[in-house]
Amino acid sequence: LIRLQKACSSGIDLAIGSRYCQGGRIENWPFSRWLLSYFANLYVRLVLWIGIKDSTAGFKCYTRKALSSINLDGNNFKGYAFQICMKYAVIKNGLSFTEVPIVFKDRELGVSKMSSGIFKEALLGVWKMRKMNL
């Protein structure tokens, strides 16, 4: 988190802790989960035409300027779609971003929040985002 904050302090509007940029990686995930995550991020890049490699990342740091630029009332998504929409809004508003490599380790306790509803919302939601006033 410190590296994300340092990136924002240096003038970047959004710093993303990325599993998929150079130097980032995932530990202890089954191949099927990695494959789903990787192709979901590729899908988002293609539909929204953004350069973020890890659009579903949960580790991020926004500047006040970035958050102030986003129409938060327009983002009614949950789960991964919410994460994607926030990042997309920053880019759509012409602000800067960077991806900072992280090592993502699979949880040792608890269960994933992924559900078919969250997956469907993200899959269809990116098409809605293209038309939204963010």
What do these predicted ranges mean?
Residues 124-134:
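C-terminal, non-catalytic tails of nucleotide-sugar-dependent glycosyltransferases
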Residues 70, 88-90, 96, 112, ...:
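Amphipathic alpha-helical interaction segments
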Residues 94-118, 132-134:
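Unusually extended, aromatic-enriched hydrophobic runs near protein termini
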Residues 50-51, 74-78, 87-105:
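Catalytic donor-sugar/metal-binding loop of nucleotide-sugar-dependent glycosyltransferases
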Residues 8, 21, 91-94, 126:
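Generic helix-packing signal
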Residues 14-16, 98, 127:
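Residue-level marker of intrinsically disordered, low-complexity segments enriched
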Residues 84:
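DNA-recognition element of transcription regulators
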Residues 1-80, 107-122:
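Acceptor/aglycone-binding surface of glycosyltransferases and processive sugar-polymer synthases
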